[in-house]
Each structure stands twice: as structure tokens, then as C-alpha cells.
């Protein structure tokens, strides 16, 4: 889903400004879109050449994946009950206790992706219709550490389809910073009923843009929506 949505952030490289302004903006958007009671927002990822030099995990991901498997429900509950500062701060901002996630009737993860660089970049993002990808086409693998962190999780790789027209792909060319993509990456309710909760996605090389000229600059945040 592509949404027209502006932000008051003026410097996307300023982590403090992003945390103080953008987290609140995206929390409100997540609640409006989902109807959830609470939305926890903690951490963000800037994907740009400078960040990629610091850790390769911050480069645009050029293979088809969906972030989380069925095991993410337990992992995110454990995470918010940990002693780490980031989840504790997110709970504090929402005036919630550490058991709030585990005691929720439903957990929904919404990811928000925003282009903060040139409208036509070298590695834009493409999304695949979840209904066109079966569970049998998803391959689980474990990420023990992402960008040097200590939060491990299981993720989906997506197998190539039998025919080129099976998976339905969408891209949103020339996005500006006044637009945001929303994708669902986990839903405990849909997972429990065997319905697709994944959204396969990947960066891809725009054949009309030379590599790095201009390079992609984007920001991602993830909302843990509680019902």
C-alpha cells in the first residue's frame, strides 16, 4: 500500500530528530490504518551508501524475502520482556508494561518504507502480492544477528515460481518523501488461521539508473500493533 503522508522531519540523517518526530508520526499512522489499541515504535534503519559502509546489512536487500515467520510472535514477546533499553523505551512511550505484548489478543507488525533521496534511484523497492505466494514457496532460515545486534529471528526466503506470471509484483516509481509504503510482515491472527501474513519484497536494479547514481536513500520503521 502506497500512502500519501508527509513528515515534519527535516534531516533524515539526524537519529535524534527521527526518534523525536518520526516515531510519533508513524505510531499515529499505524493506529489509524490498523485500528489497534497501541502501536510500539522502536528503532529505525537508514539504507544509504554511508550506512552500508558501516555494516553490509544496511545496504538494500536484493533477494526476495519476507521479514518474519510464524515464530515471530514468541520472539517479539520475549524481546519486549527483556532488559534492553530500546523495547523498554518503546513501552514507556506507550505507557505499557513489559507483559503488554504477550497479553495482547493479536499482534500485527506493519513496516513503513519511505524514500528520502532522489525520486528515481538505483535500487527501488518492489512488493509481491501475498495471496500469489503460497506457504510452500517460503523457505525458513534463521538470522542469528542483524547488523551486529543480538536479536535473533526466523525469516522467509521466497523460492522462484514455476511460471513467471505466478507471483504478482508491484513497484512505485519516483516516490517522494511525502509518500510511504506500508507492508504487513507478521499477523498472529492470520498466522494462527493459516492465512498469508507475509509480504515478499526486494530491492531491484532500475535498468535506467546507473549503480550509485543516484544511490538509494530510504528509511524504515516497524510498528508492533497490539489489539
Question: What feature does the model see in each segment?
Answer:
Residues 154-227:
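Catalytic core of Fe(II)/2-oxoglutarate
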Residues 86-123, 132-135, 141:
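Internal, well-folded beta-alpha domain core
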Residues 36-38, 107-111, 122-124, 180, ...:
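Extracellular structured ligand-interaction cores
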Residues 1-5:
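Conserved small/polar residues in nucleotide/adenosyl-binding loops
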Residues 7-19:
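Short histidine-centered catalytic/ligand-binding loop motif
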Residues 43-45, 111-116, 129-131, 223-225:
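Short, structured patches in soluble enzyme cores that scaffold and shape functional sites
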Residues 120-180:
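Double-stranded beta-helix
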Residues 23-87:
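Long, hydrophobic, well-ordered secondary-structure blocks that form the structural core
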Amino acid at each position: 500500500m502506497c500512502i500519501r503522508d508527509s513528515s515534519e522531519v527535516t534531516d533524515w540523517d539526524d537519529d535524534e530528530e527521527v526518534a523525536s518526530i518520526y516515531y510519533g508520526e508513524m505510531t499515529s499512522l499505524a493506529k489509524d490504518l490498523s485500528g489497534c489499541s497501541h502501536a510500539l515504535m522502536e528503532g529505525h534503519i537508514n539504507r544509504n551508501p554511508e550506512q552500508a559502509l558501516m555494516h553490509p546489512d544496511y545496504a538494500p536487500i536484493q533477494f526476495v524475502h519476507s521479514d518474519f515467520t510464524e515464530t515471530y510472535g514468541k520472539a517479539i514477546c520475549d524481546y519486549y520482556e527483556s532488559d534492553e533499553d530500546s523495547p523498554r523505551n518503546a513501552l514507556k512511550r506507550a505507557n505499557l508494561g513489559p507483559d503488554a505484548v504477550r497479553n495482547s489478543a493479536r499482534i500485527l507488525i506493519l513496516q513503513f518504507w519511505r524514500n528520502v533521496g532522489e525520486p528515481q534511484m538505483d535500487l527501488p523497492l518492489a512488493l509481491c502480492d501475498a495471496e500469489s505466494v503460497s506457504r510452500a514457496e517460503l523457505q525458513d532460515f534463521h538470522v542469528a544477528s542483524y547488523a551486529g545486534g543480538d536479536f535473533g529471528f526466523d525469516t522467509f526466503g521466497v523460492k522462484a515460481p514455476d511460471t513467471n506470471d505466478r507471483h504478482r509484483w508491484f513497484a512505485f516509481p519516483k516516490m517522494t518523501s511525502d509518500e510511504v509504503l506500508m507492508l504487513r510482515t507478521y499477523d498472529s491472527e492470520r498466522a494462527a488461521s493459516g492465512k498469508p501474513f507475509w509480504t515478499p519484497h526486494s530491492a531491484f536494479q532500475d535498468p535506467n539508473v546507473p549503480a550509485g547514481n543516484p544511490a538509494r536513500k530510504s528509511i524504515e520503521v516497524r510498528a508492533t500493533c497490539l489489539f
